[in-house]
Curated annotation (Swiss-Prot):
This is Phosphoribosylaminoimidazole-succinocarboxamide synthase. It catalyses: 5-amino-1-(5-phospho-D-ribosyl)imidazole-4-carboxylate + L-aspartate + ATP = (2S)-2-[5-amino-1-(5-phospho-beta-D-ribosyl)imidazole-4-carboxamido]succinate + ADP + phosphate + 2 H(+). Pathway: Purine metabolism; IMP biosynthesis via de novo pathway; 5-amino-1-(5-phospho-D-ribosyl)imidazole-4-carboxamide from 5-amino-1-(5-phospho-D-ribosyl)imidazole-4-carboxylate: step 1/2. Its EC number is 6.3.2.6. One of its GO terms (cellular component) is cytoplasm. Keywords: ATP-binding, Ligase, Nucleotide-binding, Purine biosynthesis. Belongs to the SAICAR synthetase family. It is an enzyme of class 6 (ligase). GO terms for biological process: 'de novo' IMP biosynthetic process. SUPFAM superfamilies: SAICAR synthase-like.
């Protein structure tokens, strides 16, 4: 049975960060298994909050956090041969405080390594859509990458491209940046490692998704490093929050395809008289229900997991 969680409440676990969707807690050593107490770990909780245009909307999508967590875990396991990830395998229930309803958290939270975040959003695009399409219409480029003339909306790119952005605070907008700016922000060696990992994972995931009847139009990754400089993929992976998923049988060049992601909510919000700043508008129940159905469909079609 899916649960609903808008805000985490975990007495005894210090709240480290409250993001648009995820709440991140430090885990005191006394709550960790004895053989892991030499390390530093976090509890990351995927709530049912929904953000659009970098604004957290007031209405939760019931069960969304559980769906996101299960999709992420599926992809983390599927891609661990390509790139190490932040998961530890430590049982979530074992680190939760006593006296709470642990069933609210066990399917929507993970225990992870504590890493130093790379200060960019790592985006891979295989199709020309969204802000990439807008950039192309204006300049013929996306994040400084020159593309062929005459491409249409939603058209497949000759090759997937790496188009990073800044990591804005909650309520502020991410900004697309070119690779030279990325190098200035994080250094040449790390920028190249992040770019290579982003495109490597995208190629693998796009091929797998296509075999499931889904096009992976674009996706966003976050990376972090440990004290030895080893690079990990972290946060979430290939979820409907961080990716555009299109059903293959409804894909058509020249128009924005229907999707299994929150683009559906963005499209609804575009019809409103809203300036894309907080507070966000209330969502009708029909939009909430249809959004949940899209996320559920993505989980079932990609991972073969039925959830209700």
């Amino acid at each position: 049975m899916l649960t609903t969680l808008l805000q985490s409440d975990l007495p005894g676990l210090p709240l480290r960060h409250c993001g648009k969707v995820r709440d991140v807690f430090d885990i005191p050593h006394k709550r960790l298994p004895v053989d892991t107490r030499s390390g530093e770990y976090l509890l990351i909780v995927a709530t049912d909050r929904l953000s659009a245009f970098d604004v957290v909307l007031p209405d939760p999508i019931p069960g969304k956090g559980e769906i996101l967590c299960q999709i992420s875990n599926f992809w983390f396991q599927k891609t661990e041969h390509l790139m190490p990830n932040h998961l530890t395998g430590i049982n979530v229930a074992s680190v939760l405080p006593d006296g709470i309803d642990k069933t609210l958290y066990t399917q929507r939270a993970v225990v992870t390594k504590k890493l130093k975040p790379v200060r960019i959003e790592a985006i891979a695009r295989g199709y020309l859509i969204g802000s990439g399409w807008k950039d192309y219409q204006r300049t013929g480029k996306v994040s400084g990458i020159q593309l062929p003339d005459g491409l249409q909306e939603a058209e497949k790119l000759p090759d997937p491209i790496f188009t990073p952005s800044t990591k804005a605070a909650v309520g502020h907008h991410d900004e697309n940046i070119d690779f030279d700016t990325t190098v200035k922000m994080v250094g040449a060696e790390l920028a190249e490692r992040v770019r290579d990992a982003t495109l490597r994972i995208y190629h693998f995931a796009a091929k797998y998704a296509a075999e499931c009847g889904i096009l992976l139009a674009d996706t966003k990754f976050e990376f972090g490093t440990d004290i030895d400089g080893r690079l990990y993929v972290m946060d979430e992976m290939l979820t409907p929050d961080s990716s555009r998923y299109w059903p293959i049988d409804e894909y058509q060049v020249g128009t924005s395809p229907p999707s299994y992601d929150k683009q559906f909510v963005r499209n609804y919000l575009e019809t409103l008289d809203w300036d894309k700043t907080a507070p966000g508008p209330t969502l009708p129940q029909d939009i909430i229900d249809r959004t949940r159905a899209k996320y559920t469909k993505a989980l079932q079609q990609l991972a073969g997991i039925n959830i209700d």
